[in-house]
Amino acid sequence: MATPHINAQMGDFADVVLMPGDPLRAKYIAENFLDNAVQVCDVRNMFGYTGTYKGRKISVMGHGMGIPSCSIYVTELIKDYGVKKIIRVGSCGAVNEGIKVRDVVIGMGACTDSKVNRIRFKDHDFAAIADYKMVKAAEEAAKARGIDVKVGNLFSAELFYTPDPSMFDVMDKYGIVGVEMEAAGIYGVAAEYGAKALAICTVSDHIKTGEQTTSEERQNTFNEMIEIALDSVLIGDQAGY
């Protein structure tokens, strides 16, 4: 049964869905990392695919840019298609000099200037956090591949073009490991519907130094992040979580 934004049928999605912002990155992941991948949805060109990774059924689908967009897709995947785990695999900006372009960061929590979780939580602060066991599995996956990851809080911004750049200094002071636009919303939706979620991001640009990757690199590379996400699913299965 299709939803207003996803034209897949029940059973088309695996219980775990990797979600990049860019639907073309979803296509890239399906074509380069999954076996026997089949496209299951394409409404508004927000492509979704299901295949297998080392024999394990896994899906991948884009979620668009910003909390409103990703919240729609994550809600429908969990509520209507029975998805149990969401792994965001996206890009982020760095504000700390100790974090470099192309580093991989894991968001154990996500701060935000959005009010969406306050709306959900009756105007109280909600601690938007990842599932602990998913964080643990991702760390183990990175260690097994010899990839150094930074674990900490993300900041999910409402505005890409911020009118107050001084906020980046505050984020740096508070130890923010990456600035992006979705994790806090995804964690909020997962909590609302009793699912689990994790955001793994690759640093695409450094807000303070100006170093950045190209749009083509963001679409077609960042393979370490994808491998960590996929391996973490297998580790979670083996450990019973």
From Swiss-Prot:
Q: Name one Pfam family in it.
A: PNP_UDP_1
Keyword annotations from UniProtKB, A to Z = Glycosyltransferase, Transferase
Annotated a purine D-ribonucleoside binding sites: H5, E180, M181, E182, S204, D205
Work out whether the entry's keyword set contains Glycosyltransferase. yes
Q: Name one GO cellular component term.
A: cytosol
UniProt-annotated binding residues for phosphate: G21, R25, R44, R88, V89, G90, S91
Concerning SUPFAM superfamilies, the annotation shows:
Purine and uridine phosphorylases
The active site lies at D205 (proton donor)
EC id: 2.4.2.1
Q: Which InterPro entries match?
A: DeoD-type, Nucleoside_phosphorylase_CS, Nucleoside_phosphorylase_d, Nucleoside_phosphorylase_sf
Q: Which GO terms describe its biological process?
A: purine nucleoside catabolic process
Q: Where is this site: Important for catalytic activity?
A: R218
**Could you tell me what reaction this enzyme catalyses?**
a purine D-ribonucleoside + phosphate = a purine nucleobase + alpha-D-ribose 1-phosphate; a purine 2'-deoxy-D-ribonucleoside + phosphate = a purine nucleobase + 2-deoxy-alpha-D-ribose 1-phosphate
- What GO molecular-function term can you cite, just one? purine-nucleoside phosphorylase activity
Domain of life of the native organism:
Bacteria
Entry keyword Glycosyltransferase? yes
Question: What is known about what this protein does?
Answer: Catalyzes the reversible phosphorolytic breakdown of the N-glycosidic bond in the beta-(deoxy)ribonucleoside molecules, with the formation of the corresponding free purine bases and pentose-1-phosphate.
Give the UniProt family note.
Answer: Belongs to the PNP/UDP phosphorylase family.
User: What is its quaternary makeup?
Assistant: Homohexamer; trimer of homodimers.
Q: What protein name applies here?
A: Purine nucleoside phosphorylase DeoD-type 1
Name the gene that codes for it.
deoD1
